[in-house]
């Protein structure tokens, strides 16, 4: 199944507007998933499809040093020694098994379980969602919230709970999403984080890019997803892409949303500088030759 492209985004400002929910450039997956900003992507002629479990990409960004520093927080991604910083290009090896690399401290985990201005799970609207989730998964839930199955259940539940995928919203709070049952990937991730935290599961929102391979090609989209601390690791949960589980996907993080207070929109501007303007999928041999 292929994405239907509505309009392509080619500027950093477009990435900011998609985070804010403004109508600039979007695509839709089927009829049951939210919209995403399309990022220009090309594939070198000597790269064959389907893609392997690891890909090598050149990523043009506004602030390559900052973008590279963010990637150090994950396993399954590595920067090539051959960097074109003067052209704002990062050469990256990216695995489809990307996951957070840094083990959080007790204080960090406490922060990712907190009720905040954006992830406001103590609000009545979100508590209603929590009750609905527990009613549906009570037999599986038990008293073990640390199992990755809970993350899968949260993903499935939020994917079905948001019944009107749409890009007409600004970046909404969890309680707003709980009431509207509408939104794009940011709304999916905010509500999923709220549900997890209400269950005492540390959860965070990641902003970045997802590269998706479907039957006829490869495309890249500005995106937001979750990571939840389950089974002693950061486990990815992506309710917005739940219906695309059969497709091969590569996640390229740009920002961990840490400021969930009143100044959250200022914090999101950090993601702008790390978001790709252009992605080129290259062969492994090209990058090895460049490193040598």
Tell where the protein language model's regions lie, with residue ranges.
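Bacterial N-terminal signal peptides that target proteins for export
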Residues: 2-16
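Intrinsically disordered, low-complexity N-terminal segments that are enriched in acidic
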Residues: 30-101
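Secondary-structure boundary elements
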Residues: 108-183, 191, 258, 268-292
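Cysteine-centered nucleophilic/redox motifs
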Residues: 150, 154-156, 182-209, 226
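Catalytic cysteine-centered active-site loop
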Residues: 164-172, 205-215
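Active-site rim recognition segments
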Residues: 211-292
């Amino acid at each position: 199944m292929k994405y239907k492209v509505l309009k392509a985004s080619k500027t950093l400002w477009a990435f900011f507007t998609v985070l804010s929910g403004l109508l600039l450039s979007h695509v839709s997956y089927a009829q049951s998933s939210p919209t995403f900003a399309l990022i220009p992507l090309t594939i070198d002629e000597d790269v064959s499809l389907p893609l392997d479990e690891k890909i090598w990409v050149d990523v043009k960004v506004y602030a390559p040093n900052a973008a590279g520093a963010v990637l150090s927080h994950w396993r399954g991604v590595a920067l090539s020694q051959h960097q074109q910083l003067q052209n704002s290009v990062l050469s990256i090896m990216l695995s489809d098994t990307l996951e957070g690399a840094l083990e959080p401290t007790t204080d960090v985990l406490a922060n990712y379980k907190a009720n905040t201005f954006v992830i406001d799970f103590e609000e009545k609207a979100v508590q209603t969602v929590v009750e609905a989730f527990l009613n549906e998964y009570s037999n599986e839930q038990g008293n073990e919230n640390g199992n990755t199955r809970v993350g899968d259940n949260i993903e499935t539940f939020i994917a079905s709970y948001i019944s009107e995928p749409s890009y007409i919203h600004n970046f909404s709070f969890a309680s707003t999403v709980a009431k509207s049952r509408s939104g794009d990937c940011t709304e999916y991730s905010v509500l999923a984080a709220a549900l997890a935290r209400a269950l005492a599961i540390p959860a965070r929102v990641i902003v970045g890019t997802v590269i998706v391979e479907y039957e006829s090609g490869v495309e890249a989209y500005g995106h937001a997803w979750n990571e939840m601390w389950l089974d002693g690791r950061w486990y990815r949960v992506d309710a917005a892409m739940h219906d695309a589980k059969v497709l091969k996907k590569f996640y390229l993080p740009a920002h961990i949303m840490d400021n969930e207070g009143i100044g959250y929109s200022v914090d999101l501007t950090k993601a702008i500088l790390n978001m790709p303007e252009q992605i080129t999928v290259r062969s492994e041999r090209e990058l090895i030759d460049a490193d040598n």
